[in-house]
């Protein structure tokens, strides 16, 4: 192998590594039910869903959340230590996993669906409009979604697209993005633990393809 080829391969490896790192920590807030604690739901607790759109598992140890107080009252996420690539997990405000699973799935809960908790003063999700802010182990804001009034609603806010640092208003509709009516509470509509296939964000692929293209051009020019 000549020096040129060796250099190109080394550079390509660095570029590919950089591209992969872009996708590794793409955890997004993909569903929110801010009405669940104030309504007549059997489990009586608000909840939200996180989805890993990256290409490797993400360690959630030390991660935390807050509502629209933006970090001043943040509390730890507990009960889940890792979220696999493509996996969606649920966090409820109180420990109500058994009632939650029974309400949504009856006795057919998805195998391996993870449910964690967040508990503390000042982090209840308001029906008049609020936010979910997600912080990584370094205390940095990693993902956030705001939402408007949910008074009178029994459909979750649906962010299956994985949008970040924005507002969500789309409501879950049965048959769309995996949404369904809860087995034991038919007025509730959502898709806890299931969204369209999570894949690395487009910019990751664009970066990888661009890098390979650049190295290919350089190699051809050197060979002339």
Model-flagged regions — what are they?
Residues 62, 86, 129, 190-193, ...:
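Glycine-centered flexibility sites
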Residues 3-6, 137, 160, 165, ...:
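N-terminal cationic leader/targeting segments used for protein routing and processing
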Residues 7-8, 18, 22, 103, ...:
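Compositionally biased regions
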Residues 6-9, 31, 218:
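Short helix-onset patch at the extreme N-terminus, typifying the N->h transition
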Residues 216-224:
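C-terminal membrane-anchoring or membrane-association module
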Residues 24-167:
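Activation on beta-sandwich/Ig-like modules and their edge loops
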Residues 3-13, 18-26, 194-212:
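Short, threonine-centered small-residue motifs that mark membrane-proximal processing/anchoring sites
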Residues 169-198:
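A recurrent domain-boundary module in secreted/ectodomain proteins
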